[in-house]
């Protein structure tokens, strides 16, 4: 009986998870629902779970003192992305931008639901949602940090596969647009990336034309 009392006492003294920890748990659980998988070192992982981890890692590197709300926005960047497939929208640039806009709104709405469950106030939720929608890019340092992380994740992990599926001119065009969205600090990091020889050659060509 005394042992049980001690164990219950110890349990009651354990710190409760913070609202930030609760939010991350909820967010990551949603990411694990992604039906698309990526194999890394022989292990199949949900693609969006991997993306979220990579985004968080880059923000930690770019801005070690990043605010709690920026960290949450970064983690929510592709929340339930698979629920709105690209083929719902017309082909071409206009359809692509319509899809991206719909995605950003959906990610922000889904994030709001989870953050309320975790105990965040409406002002904090609104700030996270604005970051997810990338509002005031270039004017807002936190929005720029999120965008930098997204660009670096693309260059480090997405570029080789994209380059294999598209013609060189299209890839170079995308790389130039990506580069134009990045801050000077992010560009420095990009130049230090260990890219495949083909990806590096494409990036060099893109930068030569900027």
Regions from the PLM with identified roles:
Residues 1-12:
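N-terminal amphipathic/basic-hydrophobic helices that include classical n-h-c signal peptides
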Residues 19-56, 89-98, 102:
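Active-site flanking loop/helix segments enriched in acidic
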Residues 39, 85-88, 144-146, 190-191:
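Short coil/turn segments at secondary-structure boundaries
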Residues 42-70, 111-118, 123-126:
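Alpha-helical phosphate/pyrophosphate-handling elements in metalloenzyme active cores
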Residues 68-87, 91, 107, 111, ...:
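His-Asp-centered metal-binding catalytic motifs of divalent-metal-dependent phosphohydrolases/nucleases
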Residues 74, 121-152, 156-159, 163-166:
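Histidine/acidic-rich helix-loop-helix segments that form or flank divalent-metal centers
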Residues 89-110, 166-192, 199:
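Divalent-cation-assisted or electrostatically stabilized phosphate/pyrophosphate-binding catalytic cores
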Residues 193-210:
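Long hydrophobic alpha-helical segments typical of transmembrane helices together
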